Regions:
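Hydrophobic side chains in beta-strands
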Residues: 73, 108, 132, 145, ...
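Short histidine-centered beta-strand/loop micro-motifs
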Residues: 96, 115-122, 141-143, 169-171
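Residues that flank catalytic or metal-binding motifs in active/ligand-binding sites
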Residues: 102, 124-126, 175
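Conserved beta-strand residues within beta-sheet cores
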Residues: 103, 116, 127-129, 165
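Fe(II)/2-oxoglutarate oxygenase catalytic core
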Residues: 1-105, 109-119, 190-198, 203-247
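Short, conserved beta-strand element in jelly-roll/cupin
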Residues: 108-110, 121-137
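Catalytic core of Fe(II)/2-oxoglutarate
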Residues: 137-223
């Protein structure tokens, strides 16, 4: 089994794994491609309805101009909103068959814009892009993982390991929209809760505690204790929170 790598660990990702994956190796994703005509209208209607609700995404400072925006419904195993599930029941029905789904969002990249090179949070997931509105293919619009470029196609999955440095661009005159989901890789599936809790712990510490002077000045020992406390709370609370929201 490969080891789990985390961006926030500070360790160098070894880059000894596949950059891209093929959807025909994942039956539950292939089913969605087969039913694309059935779910296309549902997704496009929802995107039109929520057009003004997309939020600028500046993860790792790669989107300073604000041309990359998203609507997030599930974030590292935590359900932020069940609106997608209510408004897109057909799509949701097929998504339920995907093991290890931990993140779900809609991503829009404006015309004549790009997302700078960056790495994802961990190699424990497979990032999956389903093309919804794809104005054109390579070389004008595409994704680069490592040194390999691929274009999106409407109704087709583009699957990749976002622990690799990757970037995206859209040099066309129209916006590009994809459905993004992250699913825990099969070999790490038994560690799903731990993976989600750990990444959420990094988020809490970096975005909340990390900016406070007392925490910044605290010893490595104290920081480890705080990490352990936050991790334990999230490890227990996150599944309970989701149970309450879906019951």
């Amino acid at each position: 089994m490969k080891e789990i790598w985390y961006y926030e660990s500070g360790n160098t990702y070894p880059e000894n794994e596949s950059k891209y994956y093929e959807s025909n190796g994942f039956p539950q994703l292939a089913i969605i491609e087969e039913h694309w005509t059935e779910i296309k209208e549902e997704l496009k209607n929802f995107i039109e309805e929520k057009d003004r609700s997309f939020q600028s995404n500046n993860y790792q400072g790669v989107n300073i101009e604000g041309n990359w925006s998203s609507l997030t419904f599930v974030f590292w195993g935590s359900m932020l909103s069940n609106e997608f599930h209510k408004k897109c029941p057909i799509t949701t029905c097929y998504l339920k068959g995907i093991k290890g789904l931990v993140s779900l969002s809609l991503s829009r990249l404006s015309a004549h814009s790009s997302i700078a090179r960056h790495r994802g949070d961990t190699n424990a997931i497979m990032r999956c892009h389903l093309g919804i509105d794809v104005p054109t293919g390579l070389p004008q619009c595409g994704l680069k993982v490592g040194e390999e470029e691929r274009g999106w196609q409407e109704g087709k999955w583009t699957l990749f390991n976002d622990a690799y440095i990757h970037s995206a661009w859209n040099n066309s005159d129209k916006g590009r929209v994809v459905l993004i989901l992250d699913t825990i890789r099969l070999e790490f599936l038994n560690k799903k809760n731990s993976i989600c809790a750990r990444i959420l712990t990094y988020q809490v510490i970096n975005n909340k505690l990390g900016r406070k002077k007392p925490f910044k000045k605290s010893s490595f020992f104290v920081k480890n204790i705080v990490f352990g406390i936050v991790f334990t709370i999230l490890y227990i609370y996150r599944p309970l929170q989701n149970f309450i929201k879906t019951s």
